[in-house]
Amino acid sequence: MAEELVKPYNGDPFVGHLSTPISDSGLVKTFIGNLPAYRQGLSPILPGLEVGMAHGYFLIGPWVKLGPLRDSDVANLGGLISGIALILVATACLAAYGLVSFQKGGSSSDPLKTSEGWSQFTAGFFVGAMGSAFVAFFLLENFLLSMAS
C-alpha cells in the first residue's frame, strides 16, 4: 500500500523529493503557483509588496499580546516599534541575500533571480511591511478590543 502512495519524483530516487498524493495534487500545485513569488508576469516589486504587507500586518499582534509591554497602556506602541525593528532586520537580511546570491548584470528569464529584481523585491517588501505595520497599529489603537486573558 505504501508503495502506491509514496514514490520517487519522476521515478528517480536520487532527486531527493518524494512524490506524495498531497504534493502532487492539483489543489496544492495551484495554491503554490498562486503564491506571490511564483506568479508570472509581475514586476518583482509587486510580489515584494504583497509579501511585505502580509508580514508587517501579522508581526504586530504577537508583540502587542506577548511582548514585555503587554500589560501596559503603551503595548500597541511597543508592538509597533518592535515590529518595525524586526522588519528592518528582515529587510537587511533580504538585501544581504541578494548581494551574495546574484551577480551584478546577470541575466535570467526570472526577474527574481537577478540582482536588480531582488533589489526591487526587497524594496517592495520594506514598503509593504512598514505600511501594513502602521495599519495594524492604527487598527489596534482606534478599535476597542477585548483585552480579557
UniProtKB/Swiss-Prot annotation:
The chain crosses the membrane at residues 80-100, 125-145. It is a multi-pass membrane protein. Pfam families: PsaL (PF02605). The keyword Transmembrane helix applies. GO terms for cellular component: photosystem I reaction center; plasma membrane-derived thylakoid membrane. Keywords: Membrane, Photosynthesis, Photosystem I, Thylakoid, Transmembrane, Transmembrane helix. It comes from the Bacteria. GO terms for biological process: photosynthesis. It is found in: Cellular thylakoid membrane. The keyword Transmembrane helix applies. InterPro entries: PSI_PsaL (IPR003757), PSI_PsaL_sf (IPR036592), PSI_suXI (IPR022980). SUPFAM superfamilies: Photosystem I reaction center subunit XI, PsaL. HAMAP family: PSI_PsaL (MF_00447). NCBIfam families: PRK00704.1-3 (NF001926). PANTHER family: PHOTOSYSTEM I REACTION CENTER SUBUNIT XI, CHLOROPLASTIC. Belongs to the PsaL family. This is Photosystem I reaction center subunit XI. It comes from Synechococcus elongatus. The gene is psaL.
